[in-house]
Amino acid sequence: MQFEPALQQGRLVKRYKRFLADIKLADGSEMTIHCPNTGSMRNCLFPGEAVWFSTSANPKRKYAYTWELMGTPNGGFIGIHSGSANALAEEAIHSGIIKELTGYDTLSREVKYGDENSRIDILLQGAQKPDCYIEVKSCTLLEDGQGFFPDAVSLRGQKHLRELMHMANLGHRAVLLFVVQHSEIFSVAPAAHIDHEYANLLKKATLSGVEVLAYRCEMSPTEIRLAQACPVRV
């Protein structure tokens, strides 16, 4: 996924009210940009470090700029736009990066499924193959060298695991895909210390036939894309 037009750079001052962040520009002026992340962003906020933001062509938007990347003290990157995970996954499936998800004929987004009024992120279908239901999650929490999900209690994430188990029990293929948008995360594990119920459900899901995959992103101020698989420690 190319960043077009090119991202602009500033320095983080603070994130607040969940969807807003103040940044400082090179000329010393400050401005407010949109923060497209509904999570806690635990361990992802580094005041004074570089941020990169995109510009919207929509003149009706209250905030014309959107936070895309956070620089880390170690020179790495964190993808802030959690909503881009689905698009990154779709792009990687089409390009054959995710080897486990090749060989299907069609890809659909936001299809109704399950028995809890849910919509699947990605549905793959192919001749003489079971339908493949894929839930995509963005992973950015790094603690003690380990990547974790979720970064806050996630009732929605718990529901999605139940739905995936339901689809697996019906004979479909069910996949949980972690899109790792932190350049210093090399493996993913359930955050039992944050959401114990999610961790328990994930173990049950794997025993029920749900596949769990994780792919790391390569990130720069010009591009972000899924690049390589990494271990998931359930």
From Swiss-Prot:
A Pfam family it matches: SfsA
Highest rank taxon of the organism: Bacteria
GO molecular function: DNA binding
InterPro entries, alphabetized: SfsA, SfsA_C, SfsA_N
Disulfide pairings: none
Family from the record: Belongs to the SfsA family.
HAMAP family on file: SfsA (MF_00095)
Protein name per UniProt: Sugar fermentation stimulation protein homolog
Species per Swiss-Prot/TrEMBL record: Shewanella sp. (strain W3-18-1)
